[in-house]
């Protein structure tokens, strides 16, 4: 009996570890354009061999940058990712000034800003369908949520209405992610994410290990309050830049957190051991 329980524990541990890499975020950067098509092919094949089945592309438009458009390096790379067997979740439009604007705007201003940004994402969705013509399983909204800028209940209620309307206009399921600044109690925060998930949206919670903005016991409390269908994103990096500086990070081993019942993803591709070519391209670009 003891041997059976030991084997069962090993299997559960293996299943938890295997799930951790099933979905993987990729954040496109201009520096990535330096990779050849052969390098991309090898990278995506290696990613699939690692057990990843879904690639979540954080954005396909960042301000005025569209990464070459329908015939550019990003579109061609994602075609190769799909050919390697990876399912694609395509990110939409991201405003580079998003976090600055969140801090500047009051309630009515924030609602108007969000409405405009969601409109930009709808436009990007139509461009991707019409011009890029990639096979996808879901859309991803790049604008991350947190309980600092949405601490006020009225802001969360307004956002809920906007997300409901937005998701109904998409032709595939919507995914988004959130992180905690420690402003809402874990149970209240979990209930907020559950409300969003009730719209049919796949919600991902970022574990915050990479930025280290919250102590580990606090992060554990937030993870422990989450319903099982809320996904957990392990941050496979450690931030090396100081607050207020341009973001810099180095690869790090993800740390398990929360129950094994959650869907799992990692952030992000360039910090994984088999994707060193991406990290090197970024460092060689001279950009932060």
What are these regions (language model features)?
Residues 19-54, 58, 180, 270-273:
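Boundary/entry segment of secreted carbohydrate-active catalytic domains
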Residues 33-48, 121-128, 185-195, 247-256:
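Short, acidic/polar
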Residues 37-63, 195-204, 260-264:
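Catalytic domains of carbohydrate-active enzymes, especially glycoside hydrolases
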Residues 40-47, 56-98, 155-172, 219-225:
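Aromatic-lined substrate-binding rim segments of carbohydrate-active enzymes
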Residues 89-97, 140-144, 163-189, 204-209, ...:
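Aromatic-lined carbohydrate-recognition surfaces of secreted/lumenal glycan-active proteins
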Residues 90, 96-126:
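Active-site-adjacent "subsite" loops/lids of carbohydrate-active enzymes
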Residues 123-153:
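Active-site groove signature of glycoside hydrolases
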Residues 205-216, 221-222, 227-288:
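Substrate-binding cleft of secreted/luminal carbohydrate-active enzymes
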């Amino acid at each position: 009996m003891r041997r059976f329980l030991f084997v069962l524990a090993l299997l559960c541990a293996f299943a938890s570890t295997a799930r951790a890499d099933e979905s993987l975020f990729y954040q496109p950067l201009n520096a990535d354009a330096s990779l050849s098509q052969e390098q991309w092919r090898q990278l995506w094949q290696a990613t699939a061999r690692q057990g990843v089945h879904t690639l979540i592309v954080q954005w396909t438009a960042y301000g005025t940058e569209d990464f070459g458009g329908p015939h550019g390096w990003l579109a061609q790379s994602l075609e190769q990712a799909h050919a390697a067997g990876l399912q694609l979740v395509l990110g939409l439009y991201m405003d580079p000034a998003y976090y600055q604007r969140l801090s500047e705007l009051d309630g009515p201003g924030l609602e108007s800003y969000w409405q405009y940004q969601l409109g930009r994402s709808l436009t990007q969705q139509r461009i991707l369908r019409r011009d890029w013509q990639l096979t996808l399983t879901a859309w991803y909204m790049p604008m991350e949520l947190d309980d600092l800028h949405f601490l006020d209940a009225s802001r969360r209620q307004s956002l809920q209405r906007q997300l409901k309307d937005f998701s109904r206009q998409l032709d595939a399921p919507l995914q988004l992610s959130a992180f905690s600044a420690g402003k809402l109690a874990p149970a209240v925060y979990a209930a907020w994410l559950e409300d969003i998930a009730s719209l049919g949206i796949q919600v991902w919670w970022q574990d915050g290990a990479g930025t280290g903005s919250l102590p580990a016991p606090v992060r554990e409390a937030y993870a422990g309050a989450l319903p099982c269908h809320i996904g957990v994103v392990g941050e496979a990096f450690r931030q090396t830049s100081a607050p207020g500086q341009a973001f810099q990070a180095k690869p790090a081993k993800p740390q398990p957190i929360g129950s094994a019942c959650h869907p799992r993803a990692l952030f992000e591709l360039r910090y994984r051991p088999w994707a060193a070519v991406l990290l090197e391209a970024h460092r060689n670009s001279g950009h932060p």
